[in-house]
């Protein structure tokens, strides 16, 4: 994850010292298009900013986001200001930045480079990073449990409401795992990421999938691998597909080893009904192990009292229901995507056991795929993640939390029917 520490401290300070003026006078509409073009923000981030009411609130949201967008964000912002005829704002912050840079250089000459920094700005590689380098809980991970097979009786009882999933192999699976990153980028080695990759590869094979793995790909190489995979003619002969992306990330994207972003919407687009006809009406599963922000979930104390387990019902409206079957398909359907964490938050990883999310995912799928459909298994994964807590005594990350989630356009129950062979 490229967090707030990606931006130089004097760049952050220059923005902070001019924050009120920027919040009042910044004109964002065209500027944000330039920032997208420069690969600093994503379309999803623009939508999040535009959801705020009023230009001042939108500017504040943008200024909150900007320091988290990496080492190139400040210069890109200044260029975008000039390109959108807001030179007075660019000159203002550049003048402040020059003064701050000169002041810091003078202090470092006098006292050395070990100046104390605010916590959010400290990017020293020796400082334990929340999601990447610091082991947040104790102990080695257990071996992956064997996948339990479904029975012929279970298949017969549930096949009618489920996706057809009996091909051999069940489908093709692609894993893109980035662990090592370009040295000039502020993206650290993903210690424990190799455990995630090995765990998923073994799980998918045990579930009956033909697995392809690519390690340490640039953003362009990742997109190329996804495109080639989506166009494989073998998809026509199988019943499903799996894609897993394991890397650093931000909301709406995951990082290649070159520090550039692969936009998730572009990845999903490659597998939609328009671009991947061989997978039309077939379930497509995506699993994203990457941060979606840099906020640490500190958790809250649970109030005393019985835990609520039942949800109240709701009335269903029959208004505007379509009576006739359509011959056309929506552009995107039959997909389910599991995310390691919520929007804006960081994902946790243990340096020995791998990530919390992938560990929970492999455990639940191995144990429960014999008689539980994928959406319900992801609810069980959520439950395991909810109960987990960081273990890092003496650090700010002790007892931190994480919450996974999934989104779905599935139209039937997605049972994986592991081990079931028709006619046997």
UniProtKB/Swiss-Prot annotation:
The keyword Protease applies. Keywords: Apoptosis, Hydrolase, Protease, Thiol protease, Zymogen. PANTHER family: CASPASE 2, CASPASE RECRUITMENT DOMAIN-CONTAINING PROTEIN 18. GO terms for cellular component: cytoplasm; endopeptidase complex; nucleus. InterPro entries: CARD, CASP2_CARD, Caspase-like_dom_sf, Caspase_cys_AS, Caspase_his_AS, DEATH-like_dom_sf, Pept_C14, Pept_C14_caspase. Belongs to the peptidase C14A family. SUPFAM superfamilies: Caspase-like, DEATH domain. Heterotetramer that consists of two anti-parallel arranged heterodimers, each one formed by a p18 subunit and a p12 subunit. Residues 7-96 form the CARD domain. It comes from Gallus gallus. Residues 1-140 form a propeptide. Residues 296-325 are annotated as: Disordered. This is Caspase-2. PROSITE patterns: CARD, CASPASE_CYS, CASPASE_HIS, CASPASE_P10, CASPASE_P20.
